[in-house]
């Protein structure tokens, strides 16, 4: 995941101006018709719609992409011969967090992933617990917003399996919020949560996940840009709204002005 940002020119203390979904839909009749088909609005509209033309562009881009992906196709998968010999370690290579360093020295034996919020049975999973869940291995391209891409093999537990270990989500669940050791967070909607390639990866290219690539566990969201693929996962929370996280836009990158939906 790319973590060194050239920040957009924004007021860091300001919350993005909200535009009501009713106002937006009235200005985009085609999208309004699409939503009348019975699809969830969350599938087509970001958690917060920004003002002006950029907000309309956000929704049109996301809704068009999601309509094309309505059958939940897989992202392209590659052959082992296409794996990059060197996968960039971008941004934070080794968190300085004291607890993380202690867990690292212990081989992550005491590491735990709390799963809380709108689930039937909140729980805390060890790395071994996650490795015992059904797994998936995929060879995919990581497309970074910084302008580079690289192919790697990832093995991990589908996010849906992790939620099922907690008894599944309860009524009202709309987003899964993932927090990291180094202070990043992202919310992803249920459309991406249920996709089979959305995994929590603990292996890379056949070996344990390297520190620089997010050990012991990272998110792989194969149909979105690299900045959505969080490293160094610390916790998972299922929620009905992103309003109480950061500036309410749905993730730290969109708080900074990037698109919440980073489809590729």
What is the meaning of each model-derived region?
Residues 1-19, 30-34:
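N-terminal secretory signal peptides
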Residues 2, 19, 23, 42-47:
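Intrinsically disordered, low-complexity regulatory segments
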Residues 19-36, 159, 219:
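N-terminal export leaders
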């Amino acid at each position: 995941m790319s973590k060194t940002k050239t920040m957009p020119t924004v007021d860091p203390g300001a919350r993005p101006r909200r535009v009501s979904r009713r106002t937006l839909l009235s200005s985009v009749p085609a999208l309004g018709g699409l939503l009348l088909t019975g699809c969830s609005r969350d599938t087509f509209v970001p958690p917060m719609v920004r003002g002006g033309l950029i907000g309309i562009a956000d929704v049109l881009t996301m809704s068009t992409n999601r309509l094309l992906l309505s059958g939940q196709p897989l992202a392209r998968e590659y052959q082992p011969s296409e794996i990059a010999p060197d996968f960039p370690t971008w941004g934070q290579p080794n968190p300085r967090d004291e607890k993380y360093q202690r867990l690292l020295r212990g081989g992550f034996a005491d590491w735990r992933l709390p799963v809380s919020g709108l689930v039937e049975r909140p729980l805390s999973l060890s790395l071994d617990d996650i490795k015992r869940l059904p797994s998936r291995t995929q060879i995919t391209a990581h497309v970074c917003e910084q302008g580079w891409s690289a192919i790697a093999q990832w093995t991990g537990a589908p996010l849906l399996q992790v939620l099922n270990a907690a008894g599944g989500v309860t009524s009202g669940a709309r987003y899964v919020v993932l927090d990291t050791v180094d202070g990043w967070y992202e919310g992803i909607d249920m459309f991406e949560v249920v996709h089979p390639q959305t995994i929590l990866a603990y292996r890379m290219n056949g070996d344990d996940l390297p520190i620089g690539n997010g050990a012991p566990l990272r998110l792989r969201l194969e149909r979105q840009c690299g900045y959505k693929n969080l490293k160094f996962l610390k916790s998972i929370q299922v929620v009905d709204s992103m309003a109480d996280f950061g500036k309410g836009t749905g993730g730290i990158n969109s708080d900074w002005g990037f698109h919440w939906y980073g489809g590729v």
